[in-house]
Amino acid sequence: MELRKDKLLMFYSEGKESKEAKWAVNDPMSKSYKLSLPSALRPDNLLPGNRLRYTDASKSKSSKVSWYKTILDPGSEIVLKWNWVFIVSCMVALFIDPLYFFVPAIGGDKNYPCARTDTSLSILVTFFRTIADLFYLLHIFIKFRTGFIAPNSSTRVFGRGELVMDPKAIAWRYIKSDFIIDLIATLPLPQIVIWFVISTTKSYRFDHNNNAIALIVLLQYIPRFYLIIPLSSQIVKATGVVTKTAWAGAAYNLLLYMLASHVLGAAWYILSVDRYTSCWKSRCNGEAGQVNCQLYYLDCDSMYDNNQMTWANVTKVFKLCDARNGEFKYGIFGNAITKNVVSSQFFERYFYCLWWGLQQLSSYGQNLSTTMFMGETTFAVLIAIFGLVLFAHLIGNMQTYLQSLTVRLEEWRLKKRDTEEWMRHRQLPEELRNRVRRYEQYKWLATRGVDEEVLLQSLPTDLRRDIQRHLCLDLVRRVPFFSQMDDQLLDAICERLVSSLCTEGTYLVREGDLISEMLFIIRGRLESSTTNGGRTGFFNSIILRPGDFCGEELLSWALLPKSTLNLPSSTRTVRALVEVEAFALRAEDLKFVANQFRRLHSKKLQHTFRFYSHHWRTWAACFIQAAWRRYKRRVMENNLTAIESMENEEGEVGEELVVVEEEECVEESPRTKMNLGVMVLASRFAANTRRGVAAQRVKDVELPRFKKPEEPDFSAEHDD
């Protein structure tokens, strides 16, 4: 025991293991059973006496592995949650990047405008862009630590395949596939261009800053947008859908459409600024005068330069480039200049450009009036193409998601229409049609068009059992007949219960019909009646409420030691008074449950069955009624016997006094006459009563008693 407790091994000098070592290694109950010999022979495991302490390799390995070296399962919960977080961060990053297009702006006054850079906006956008880049960097790290399913593994024939957890194989596969795209999407290229490239080449900033920013952002925007596609595919493979609700899916597609409008509006803005400054440059290069035009004069940083101020007073560049004069054709960019969009505050610029982009995408650019400038016409063509594709994509996906909200309702409407056509074709009477309509309506309200039985049968057995237990256990325990059973038997019952719905006026079973299931009422009321009382004119009716059951003839049949295949007949007619929800135990399932009943050996269960059985209740009521009648008859017989004895005694006394009565007949008092009349009436009543008792005895002999229900066998286990 001491060796087993400490898990110690001893090795002989010639290299043979001792019996103790073999015992410890071969014992499956020992923690050392999973360990290999090399892990036990490490020097740090040595103990005095040439003994080694056997440690749990799994625990020591897990304790030494750091969190950043852990390999993740691509289908695990943490990877799925990260994919959701990353796809949200990607959407935010895609909205942030086009904001760089609003950094170039037009400053100065109306008469002497100049090109400027919105520094405060640059700082703000750079800050949020850097945070978004950190999410991309973290995503690269997670992909280096996420396993994958072997593509050529033979295990993919069945199941999902073999999961590769080797860090080197994971890294090599990632580098060969998506690493380059992820790296390009992660690089902070706009920050580098704005804060390092343009700042160091200040003299050339006016010529190149707009084009450089637009080019860098657009080139990096493509791989960033591409990352959303495989990410959405991974979420769909793992969960089946991108969004959990239809409204979220519709909002997601609408957000993508707004993103396209956002990008289009930002591109239109920077092209408008570029078109405006291009006019300045062309007029500046062609201007000749006392003061030559220099390109840096057009920059707001040189506004306080003496030469620039002298040139601004005599130049005609700004007048010739004014969109109101019509000297220079701006085409689709004219509104940005005439409405001072390029010189407004950021929020004014942004929302106007967003509206312009949304308007052009929705109208496919039909209201655009372009010039002969090739760049402008190309931009208009792209607007028409992307507008058509994106709008069709939006409408299609929105329709799909929104239709999924009412797909069940639409199926029910189609089924209802088909049912109406069928009833009209078969010329069913209005009463039957109303019953069919009520049943379909009630079934829809109860299930919302979901076939619960098919849904549960498609799930694994263990999961189906847990769901049935959650749905049925509390309701089953409300039935007193089931409240006496243990949890194991209740689980078996819950697993076999099926829901049953009945509308008002429905006959669940009629007297004499075969019984195929036993019902346990959850909600509603049923009327159970019978005319089989053993005599003509017998009628008994009771109301079954939640907690009651009907069809116990099937239980008595199932509890028979050798029950036949023929189902029993119903002795009662059961009709729904209102809408009823119940659980049903079918005959084959009840046979299994009945076999479990026998193993309980419970008299209490037998008494509970008697108490809540309407057959036993009816028999008990008839039995008590018959006993009460017998008691009343005995009391009446005793009273009549006493009256007859009194009559006999009075008769003897009357014969002895007959002579006296005759002599005193003339002098008879009114009181004597009254006594004599009472005696005559009493004798007549006694005679009639004797005849009634005799007739009642004959009647009791002729009328059979109400048949006692069969006693279900709960106490013994029988061999098949």
Swiss-Prot record:
Keywords: Calmodulin-binding, cAMP, cAMP-binding, Cell membrane, cGMP, cGMP-binding, Ion channel, Ion transport, Ligand-gated ion channel, Membrane, Nucleotide-binding, Transmembrane, Transmembrane helix, Transport
Cytoplasmic side, ranges: 1-85, 143-178, 233-252, 399-720
SMART domains: cNMP
One cellular component term from this protein's GO annotations in UniProt: plasma membrane
Membrane-spanning parts: 86-106, 122-142, 179-199, 212-232, 253-273, 378-398
InterPro entries: cNMP-bd_dom (IPR000595), cNMP-bd_dom_sf (IPR018490), Ion_trans_dom (IPR005821), K_chnl_volt-dep_EAG/ELK/ERG (IPR003938), RmlC-like_jellyroll (IPR014710)
GO molecular function, one term: voltage-gated potassium channel activity
Subcellular location: Cell membrane
Subunit description: Homotetramer or heterotetramer. Part of a functional complex containing PSKR1, BAK1, CNGC17, and AHA. Interacts with AHA1, AHA2, and BAK1, but not with PSKR1 or BRI1.
Identification of the protein by name: Cyclic nucleotide-gated ion channel 17
Organism of derivation: Arabidopsis thaliana
Gene name in the database record: CNGC17
